[in-house]
Regions:
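Active-site beta3 strand of CheY-like receiver
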Residues: 45-51
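Charged docking surfaces used in two-component/phosphorelay signaling
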Residues: 16-24
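CheY-like receiver
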Residues: 121-152
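Receiver (REC) domain active-site loop signature in two-component systems and cognate sites
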Residues: 56
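C-terminal output helix
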Residues: 107-117, 128
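Short, glycine/charged-rich "phosphate-handling" switch motifs in NTP-dependent
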Residues: 100
Length: 152
């Protein structure tokens, strides 16, 4: 049975690109363009993975992730962010609040396929969580050094 991936982005071109990248590899790709639809679709379809944009109108990806985490029907679905914002603080916040991965746009199709394959593999996902914890510590150190430097 093919794995189902819910892709949430307000940019139609990103939705088309992700679908064109993943469907040929056998994934069932469901696309929606807003946060409310993402939540209702996740409850009904129970995808194996959610790829979630952060900057969307009405309800941003962070709020969507929080609502998914609060619902017993969706709290265990892994969420990876797709974002054009590569800001350290935003990545750190996403990781701290439960995002399993943070994929920056633009991305190469082969990189997205590899991220998805890793995220759908339970052993690799656990390894990614450990790496994320290490990375969060390093990012915190970098951000703190930058703050100290800026304040001088």
């Amino acid at each position: 049975m093919p794995k189902t991936i819910l892709v949430v982005d307000d940019e139609p071109s990103i939705l088309r690109l992700v679908r064109a990248t993943l469907e040929p590899k056998g994934y069932n790709v469901i696309t929606v363009d807003n946060g409310m639809e993402a939540i209702s679709t996740a409850k009904v379809k129970q995808p194996d993975l959610i790829l979630l944009d952060i900057m969307m109108p009405k309800m941003d990806g962070n709020e969507v992730r929080h609502k998914l985490a609060e619902d017993p029907r969706t709290k265990d679905i892994p969420v990876a962010h797709l974002s054009a914002v590569g800001d350290f603080n935003q990545q750190l916040e996403a990781y701290d609040e439960g995002a399993i991965d943070y994929i920056t746009k633009p991305f190469a199709p082969q990189d997205l396929r590899q991220h998805v394959a890793d995220l759908l593999d339970p052993l690799k996902r656990e390894e990614m969580k450990r790496e994320r914890a290490k990375k969060s510590g390093k990012v915190r150190t970098i951000v703190e050094i930058m703050r100290r430097t800026d304040s001088k």
